Structures are given as structure tokens and as C-alpha cells.
UniProtKB/Swiss-Prot annotation:
UniProt GO cellular component terms: chromosome; nucleolus; nucleoplasm; small-subunit processome
Phosphoserine: residues carrying this PTM: S139, S143, S146, S180, S190, S236, S248, S250, S258, S334
Modified positions (Phosphothreonine) in chain numbering: T127, T229, T620
Gene Ontology biological process terms in this record: ribosomal small subunit biogenesis; RNA processing
Disordered, as annotated region: 1-99, 155-175, 345-367, 390-450, 520-557
Its biological purpose: Regulates the transcriptional activity of DNTT and ESR1. May function as a chromatin remodeling protein. Part of the small subunit (SSU) processome, first precursor of the small eukaryotic ribosomal subunit. During the assembly of the SSU processome in the nucleolus, many ribosome biogenesis factors, an RNA chaperone and ribosomal proteins associate with the nascent pre-rRNA and work in concert to generate RNA folding, modifications, rearrangements and cleavage as well as targeted degradation of pre-ribosomal RNA by the RNA exosome.
Biased amino acid composition, Basic and acidic residues: 166-175, 421-434
Protein name, UniProt field: Deoxynucleotidyltransferase terminal-interacting protein 2
Quaternary structure and interacting proteins, as annotated: Forms a ternary complex with DNTT and core histone; interaction with PCNA releases DNTT and H2A/H2B histones from this ternary complex. Interacts with ESR1, ESR2, PPARG and RXRA. Part of the small subunit (SSU) processome, composed of more than 70 proteins and the RNA chaperone small nucleolar RNA (snoRNA) U3.
Segments of this protein annotated with the region TdBR region: 558-615
One Pfam family cited in the UniProt record for this chain: Fcf2
Cross-link position per record: Glycyl lysine isopeptide (Lys-Gly) (interchain with G-Cter in SUMO2): K217, K254, K327, K394, K568, K594, K616, K636, K659, K668, K696, K741
Length: 766
């Protein structure tokens, strides 16, 4: 049930009816009967014990002024739907109710519950989402049952930090009531019944200044009521001693809040039978051991002094608590509904007295812890990483023999707390109560060196310490991975470069690429030896180091391996058929001092440069034979003459620059045969050649066989000759025709000669 602000004026008006109803109830007698009836049960199920101790550990929910006074008359009203819905919720969550008590001051009336061992938490009434506004008005006993019973919704989880924030001193509880109802009610339904609160540094300073005054006022105002109120002595003594232990533990455990968590199995919480003995013992052992492990170096001196006294007090209190816890389990829901109001009143009177007894010891412990932390934090910050592993083994021996049976559950609890804190780190980061509490959180999570969390804070000094701490964390982590990184340094040296000129493709810059067979065999052997050394070094690493390497260097190894493989596959190691040694080696050289150019290439380049220079010089190789030194510049006339001679060498652009060949005897005979072509081949007609001499520009070409021509109609390649005259002489038809013509010509000449002779004779005769 939630009391809103609008219901508070109505609560003030109905305050008188509360007093009348309180007098009419016969709960005073039941107040004495109730603790006795509780003593008859036996601690059978450890899960119910955990659930019953949870209300004791959490101090009472406190609302703003008269926030509960309005809820008292409403709880006394008869309810129909509200009781049924609360009964259903109680049946589903197995409510386990502790002795509730009202603490009455001048202005407000507060619901309080005892805290034997564990963390302190503010609890408000539970809001049912499915219920309507009219169902919120339920009876007083139902509200106590629903407010104190541990309800575990599966969706909400309270982190270790939120639990640690609620581990406040009882003297601070009265001033934390200023927190709004909505904020506290939203955080009411939680895993272990602990509500998170957010306090600033100014709020803490005000609280520390005001708590001492208010505690004395509360005690002075309520001394008379405490004297006249009937209180069960055994119950009050147990409550005081349990609170004394809880506060002394919470003062030391306050900086080390990350592991102060009691794991409650949800399955066991639903089917729990009462068993407080197991839970109290487990809680004590767990908190003592965890505070020893967590405050290793900063709280080393304090814990040595306080752990012994805490162990003695815990044994005494638990021995006395066992007797009371065995008798406190069997109660019906109806008895709680009848006796709830008076029990709240009795607890309310007992709490100021317990506050008075424990205020001095808690303040002394708190001041001692804060002073020692302020003095030793700067000195011990660098040393606590080295001392952490050594002390973790020693502190495990400090726990009692009863820890052995619950070691598995404690380890499970630690794992769950770490995972929850990692997920909720950013949300509850601003809720830190003290500076050492955030800084010690790193030591508890960094035991295994697998999860490294450096918390940030709003305080400037704490941020500086956290930066230093982050450096130390990285230093420790690098020491762990030093061996694995040394093995991969050779591969990563050339893979990390963005732009690499591939001097020796596919390999590192130190290795040779073009190797002989012997060199290759030697290099393969060296690579195998290096791989074996790396494997041996990896085998020497422990399982813990391998886990760290897998977490931090799997991706780097993947990238480096793929890069090296791609380089080997895509490198220019293909045989190109060129001998680079003969060509003078690679054309890119990184070492400028070791440049060795080939001598042949140098001489060739020098000769070319000399020829180019000598062409323009006057001094030529035959300079000695000249009679005079040639002029450096020629006249225009001589230049024109040279150009004319150059032009005469070719037939011009019209003949495509045909050059004039040199006339030889063979060329002259060919030209004569071409002139006589008409007489040599009478069957064809040739144009008459009027030229007397030989042509200046001509070319003699070759006949290209036409594939369309008949084979015998063309001259085969074997029968072809070098000149035209030789081909004519080799032709039989030409020769036969040439003989016949030759004889005819010779006969004519002879006839002509005889006729002239005959004519001459005749001439003389006449």
C-alpha cells in the first residue's frame, strides 16, 4: 500500500481514531505471546531463513513526516478486495514476517524492523500494479505483511552498489526520510529487500552533522515512553546485539560494498520453510570473508584489529540468535494481522534505546575507517595490486570452518554480483556514498584480472585517483600478456604499417627474397625453429594467462594472420622469367649507403652522353687531318645547297619520297631489257619509250602470286631469279623466239650485204 501526498491531510484528521483503536485492541497480551510462539519452530529450510533474516537486516521503511500516520487508520479499516489481493500475493511469495515496531516522534510515526547482520535498507509499502485505486486501502495487518514479506519479481535486480548505498548507519536513517515517496516506493520491490537511494556530498555532510543532534533528541523525547511500554526483554536484547554486529560490520564493509551480497535462490524462496540458523551463519561467514578479501591493502591495518573482535561478537550473537531463531518460525497470517500494530509500537520504543547504545561504537568505527583510508590510499594504491593475490590466499584461512560448506554458494554470489554491477555501473555511478567506496570497487572486481573496470566519479580528487588507478591496471594487464606479445612482435612489426614498399615481396624487410635452394632450405629451418619456440612459450603459460590472451589478443592474432597470408598469396613471388641479378637488382633500395650500381650500365650511360655532346662539337675524331678549323656557323648559301642535295635524293612527296638507287651493271641491263620489251614480246603492245637515257628515280619490285591464277601460269618460287635478264634467259619460249628472230635478222643482213656488192659491180659495169 502506498500513501500518497494527497492522503496525508486525511491521515492527520484520522490520527485520533488510531489511538482509540490502539487501546481497544488486545494486542498487548499477544505481544508477549507472539515471540514465544515463534520459538517453537525448527530451522528446516535455509531459504526461509534467508527470507526471514532479510526483513531483520533492513531497517524500517521511513517516509516523510506523518507519511505513515496516514496509513495507520487506513490499515485498520475493513477491506474486502484489498485483503484478497494481498492474501494472493502473500501466498505466491510466502511472506515471512519479522516483528514490526512503530517509532513515534513528535512529528512522525515510523515503521521499523530489526537488522541482525546484513545490509540496511529502506522499505516502503509495495504497490500492486494490477490493483485499482480503491483496492489500495487495505487493513493494517495486511499492509505489514505485504511491506515486510520478501517479494521477488523476476524482472528487477538490485546490484551490489545499490545494496551498499543502503548500508547506512542507523543514525542516518531518520534524515534519509526526506527522499520522495515515489522514488523510495519505486525502489521498494527488489531482489533482497534493499532500496537504492541517491545522496550527494552536501546531503552526506548535512546528515553527518545533524544525525548526532537528532539521535539525542529522539532518546530524550522517548525515554518516558520506553519506560512505560511493555517490551519483551529477550527480543530486545537479541535485536540490540544483532544491530550492534550489523553496524560494526557495515562500517568496515562500507568501502567494500561490492561483495556484500547474500545470494537467495528464487526457487528456494518460493518453497521456503523457516531456517534462520543456516542463513545467519552463512551471512556472517560471507560478510566477514568478503570484507577481508575486499579491504586487502587500504584497510589492512583496521581489519586485523576488528576481525578478531567481530568474530567473537558474531559467535556470541549467533549462539544467542540460534535459540531465538529456532522458536520464531511458526506463525499464522491471522496472528500477524491481530498483533501487527502492537509489535510495531514495541519495536519503535526499542529502537531509540538500541540507537543510543550503538551510536558511539558506530561513529568511532566510521571515523577510524575514513581516517585510515585518507592516509593510506595514496601510499597503498600502487602496492595493493601486488599484495592482492598474496592476501587473497591468507584471508581465505581467516574464515571459520563453517565456510567450507557454503563456499560454492559464496563464489556463485560473487559472480552474480560482478555481472550485475557491470550492467548497472553507469546507472548507479552517481549514488556513491564515500570516495573510498568507489575506489575499492576496482580491487574486488580485479582479483582475476579478467574484468577491468575503472569507475568515474564527480569528485575531482577521486577522478585523479581513478586515472592513476587506470594506469596501474593497464600496467598489470600488460605484464600478464608480455610473453604472448613478444612471440607475435615479428609478425606485427610489418603488418601494422599503412604503406609498405615491397622490397622483398611476401616476406619481412630483413629476409631475402631471391634465394638459392640452399638458402631457402636454411630459411625454412629457421622459421620452423621460431615456430617451435613460440609453441613452447605458449605451453608454459598457465590457463589463467591463456584466458587473458584469448580475451585480448584473439582479434589481433586473427588480423595479423590473415594479413600475412594475404601478403604471401598476393605477393609478386611469381616467376617472371627475368633474372633480376643480371638486370642490376631491384630498382628500389632503402639503404642509400649500400647502393651498388652495375658497371656496365654506368659505362653505357657515359658513352651515350659523350656521343650526344660530341655531335655538336667542332673537334671530331678526324680533326687532325683537316687543313683548317671548321667554322662554328655556316652561311645561308651553304645551308641552301645542303637542303637541295637532300631534296634530290628523293622523288618528292608525290612519289612518297622514293629514293634514287645507285646505277649498277645489273640495273643497267634490266633497264635495257625493259626498253626492248616491245621487240621481245611482239604479241603485246607496249607504249613507245622516248627516253634516251636511264631514269633517275625508279624501283624494282617483286611479283606477288595471285591465288586466283593457275599454278602453271605463274613463275614458281624455285624458278625465280635475282634480275630480269636472268629470268628472260631462263625462259625457254623467250629463248626459242629469240633464236629465230636472231637468224632472220642475220639473214637480212647478209642479203643486204650481197645486194650492195652486186649493185656496186653493176655500177662499175655501166
Amino acid at each position: 500500500m502506498v500513501v500518497t501526498r494527497s492522503a496525508r491531510p486525511q491521515a492527520r484528521n484520522e490520527a485520533t481514531s488510531v489511538e482509540s483503536l490502539r487501546q481497544k485492541n488486545s494486542a498487548v497480551t499477544r505481544l508477549h505471546v507472539h515471540p514465544k510462539g515463534r520459538k517453537g519452530s525448527s530451522p528446516d529450510n535455509p531459504n526461509t531463513t534467508e527470507s526471514q533474516t532479510t526483513p531483520e537486516r533492513s531497517p524500517a521503511p521511513k517516509t516523510r513526516k506523518s507519511g505513515t500516520t496516514g496509513s495507520l487508520p487506513e490499515m485498520n479499516k475493513p477491506a474486502t478486495d484489498g485483503e484478497i489481493s494481498e492474501a494472493e500475493s502473500d501466498c505466491s511469495s510466502v511472506p515471512e514476517v519479522q516483528d514490526p515496531v512503530f517509532r513515534v516522534t513528535r512529528r512522525r510515526q515510523i515503521l521499523v524492523a530489526g537488522t541482525p547482520v546484513s545490509s540496511v535498507r529502506k522499505r516502503l509499502k509495495i504497490t500492486r500494479v494490477s490493483e485499482s485505486h480503491t483496492e489500495e486501502v487495505v487493513s493494517e495487518a495486511d499492509s505489514h505483511v505485504s511491506g515486510i514479506s520478501r517479494i521477488m519479481p523476476p524482472t528487477e535486480i538490485t546490484t551490489r552498489r545499490s545494496k551498499a548505498k543502503s548500508q547506512r548507519e542507523p543514525k542516518q536513517e531518520s534524515h534519509v526520510e526526506v527522499i520522495s515517496d515515489a522514488e523510495s516506493s519505486c525502489s521498494d520491490i527488489s531482489f533482497s529487500g534493499i532500496a537504492t537511494r541517491r545522496t550527494t556530498r552536501s546531503m552526506q555532510r548535512k546528515l553527518q552533522a545533524q544525525t548526532e543532534e537528532n539521535n539525542t533528541k529522539i532518546v530524550l523525547e522517548n525515554e518516558k515512553e520506553i519506560i512505560h511500554t511493555p517490551v519483551n526483554l529477550e527480543d530486545s536484547v537479541n535485536r540490540r546485539t544483532s544491530r550492534l554486529l550489523a553496524r560494526s560490520l557495515s562500517q568496515i564493509n562500507k568501502p567494500n560494498f561490492s561483495n556484500n551480497e547474500i545470494y537467495n535462490d528464487p526457487d528456494d524462496s518460493f518453497f521456503g520453510i523457516s531456517g534462520k540458523k543456516l542463513a545467519v551463519k552463512k551471512t556472517r561467514n560471507f560478510t566477514i570473508r568478503e570484507e577481508k578479501q575486499d579491504s586487502i591493502s587500504p584497510l589492512k591495518e583496521i581489519t586485523k584489529q576488528n576481525c578478531k573482535s567481530l568474530d567473537e561478537e558474531a559467535k556470541k550473537i549467533i549462539d544467542g540468535g540460534k535459540e531465538g531463531n529456532e522458536k520464531n518460525s511458526q506463525l499464522n497470517l491471522s496472528e500477524f494481522q491481530d498483533t501487527g500494530l502492537q509489535q510495531l509500537v514495541s519495536q519503535r520504543h526499542s529502537t531509540p534505546e538500541s540507537d543510543k547504545t550503538t551510536s558511539e561504537s558506530s561513529t568511532l568505527n566510521h571515523e577510524a575507517v575514513m581516517k585510515s583510508l585518507a592516509q593510506t590510499f595514496a601510499v597503498v594504491e600502487m602496492d595493493r595490486w601486488n599484495e592482492e593475490r598474496k592476501n587473497a590466499i591468507k584471508t581465505s584461512d581467516c574464515s571459520e570452518p563453517g565456510d567450507g560448506s557454503y563456499s560454492d554458494s559464496d563464489e556463485e554470489c560473487t559472480v552474480i554480483g560482478v555481472s550485475e554491477d557491470m550492467s548497472k555501473e553507469k546507472e548507479v555511478d552517481s549514488e556513491s556514498d564515500t570516495k573510498p567506496s568507489n575506489l575499492e570497487f576496482n580491487t574486488t572486481q580485479d582479483k582475476d584480472d579478467s574484468v577491468l573496470l575503472v569507475l568515474s566519479s564527480d569528485e575531482s580528487q577521486q577522478s585523479e585517483h581513478s586515472e592513476n588507478e587506470e594506469d596501474t591496471v593497464c600496467f598489470v594487464e600488460n605484464n600478464g600478456n608480455k610473453e604472448s606479445l613478444n612471440g607475435d612482435s615479428e609478425n606485427l612489426s610489418h603488418d601494422n604499417a599503412l604503406f609498405v614498399i615491397d622490397t622483398t615481396p611476401g616476406l619481412s624487410a630483413d629476409k631475402n627474397f631471391y634465394l638459392d635452394e640452399e638458402d631457402k632450405a636454411g630459411e625454412v629451418a629457421t622459421e620452423e625453429e621460431e615456430e617451435e619456440e613460440e609453441e613452447e612459450s605458449e605451453e608454459e603459460l598457465s590457463d589463467h594467462d591463456r584466458n587473458k590472451d584469448n580475451e585480448f589478443s584473439d582479434e589481433d592474432n586473427l588480423l595479423s594472420n590473415t594479413k600475412s597470408k594475404l601478403l604471401k598469396l598476393m605477393s609478386s613471388s611469381i616467376d617472371t622469367g627475368l633474372n633480376i641479378k643480371e638486370l642490376g637488382g631491384l630498382y628500389i633500395n632503402f639503404n642509400a649507403d649500400k647502393v651498388q650500381l652495375n658497371k656496365r650500365t654506368l659505362t653505357q650511360m657515359k658513352e651515350k652522353r659523350k656521343d650526344e655532346l660530341l655531335q655538336k662539337t667542332v673537334i671530331t675524331p678526324e680533326f687532325e687531318k683537316n687543313y683548317c678549323v671548321p667554322p662554328y656557323s655556316e652561311s645561308k648559301y651553304k645551308l641552301q645547297k645542303k637542303r637541295r642535295q637532300e631534296r634530290q635524293k628523293t622523288a618528292g612527296d608525290g612519289w612518297f619520297g622514293m629514293k634514287a638507287p645507285e646505277l649498277t651493271d645489273e640495273l643497267k641491263n634490266d633497264l635495257k631489257a625493259l626498253k626492248m620489251r616491245a621487240s621481245m614480246d611482239p604479241k603485246r603492245f607496249y607504249k613507245k619509250n622516248d627516253r634516251d637515257g636511264f631514269p633517275k628515280y625508279f624501283q624494282i619490285g617483286t611479283i606477288v602470286d595471285n591465288p586466283a591464277d593457275f599454278y602453271h601460269s605463274r613463275v614458281p618460287k624455285k624458278q625465280r631469279k635475282r634480275t630480269i635478264v636472268e629470268e628472260l634467259l631462263a625462259d625457254s619460249e623467250f629463248r626459242r623466239y629469240n633464236r629465230r628472230k636472231y637468224s632472220e635478222i642475220m639473214a637480212e643482213k647478209a642479203a643486204n650485204a650481197a645486194g650492195k656488192k652486186f649493185r656496186k659491180k653493176k655500177k662499175f659495169r655501166n
